[in-house]
Curated annotation (Swiss-Prot):
Membrane topology reported for the UniProt record: Single-pass membrane protein
Assembly with partners or alone: The Tat system comprises two distinct complexes: a TatABC complex, containing multiple copies of TatA, TatB and TatC subunits, and a separate TatA complex, containing only TatA subunits. Substrates initially bind to the TatABC complex, which probably triggers association of the separate TatA complex to form the active translocon.
Taxonomic placement: Bacteria, Pseudomonadati, Pseudomonadota, Alphaproteobacteria, Hyphomicrobiales
Stretches with biased composition (Low complexity): 102-114, 159-187
GO (cellular component) term, any one: TAT protein transport complex
Record-given protein name: Sec-independent protein translocase protein TatB
Gene: tatB
Length: 201
């Protein structure tokens, strides 16, 4: 507290004896001792109150930390960090389902437009060169989709190049234009002649 050496204490004692006098010196020393004790007690109380306030503040901080730990739910934290991954997964799934829906719809359109082949008539072995049917908006669209479907069959990810070629040829053969019965004029059957008994053919 005060750095007083023996020589300094001796100087203070001599000054007190001279100033106060030998008669009143014991009473002054007692009052000085009491005052010093009171000041020490007050300093101790202040220190205790200050330490107590610090402990309460630390306890409040500790209580806050304990409450935070109790409120901490690791599952919610993990969900919060994984939610972007879930959203990305949902986007991928929706994209795949849309692609899967689009592929069957594209392959079903050319199948609906195909027409059955006309059987050969009168023992003919092949169809002769005839003029192709007139191209309209309805017949032009299947040809474009036929090429797209042949390309899709050839480029499907599950087939190799050797497997894709026969599939493409088979698809092209199945979609080949056939003779349209509605475009050719219908032949009228020749009228039958009545046979009479008196005429020779």
């Amino acid at each position: 507290m005060l750095d007083l050496g023996w020589s300094e204490i001796l100087v203070i004692a001599v000054v007190l004896i001279v100033v106060v006098g030998p008669k009143d010196l014991p009473r002054v020393l007692r009052s000085f001792g009491r005052t010093t004790a009171k000041m020490r007690a007050m300093a101790g109380d202040f220190r205790r109150q200050f330490d107590e306030a610090l402990r309460e503040a630390e306890l409040d901080d500790m209580k806050g930390l304990v409450d935070d730990v109790r409120k901490l739910d690791p599952r919610s934290e993990i969900r919060k960090h994984l939610s972007p991954l879930e959203e990305a997964g949902k986007e991928i799934r929706s994209g795949l389902s849309e692609a899967a829906k689009a592929k069957p719809a594209a392959s079903s359109l050319p199948a609906a437009d195909s027409k059955p082949a006309e059987p050969l008539k009168n023992g003919a072995t092949s169809l002769g060169p005839e003029a192709p049917p007139p191209v309209t908006g309805e017949t032009a669209a299947p040809k474009v989709s036929e090429k797209a479907e042949v390309g899709a069959v050839a480029a499907s990810p599950g087939t190799s190049a050797k497997q894709a070629a026969p599939k493409a040829k088979a698809a092209a053969a199945a979609k080949a234009p056939t003779k349209n019965t509605a475009s050719a004029p219908a032949k009228k059957p020749s009228p039958r002649r009545k046979k009479t008994a008196g005429t020779a053919p």
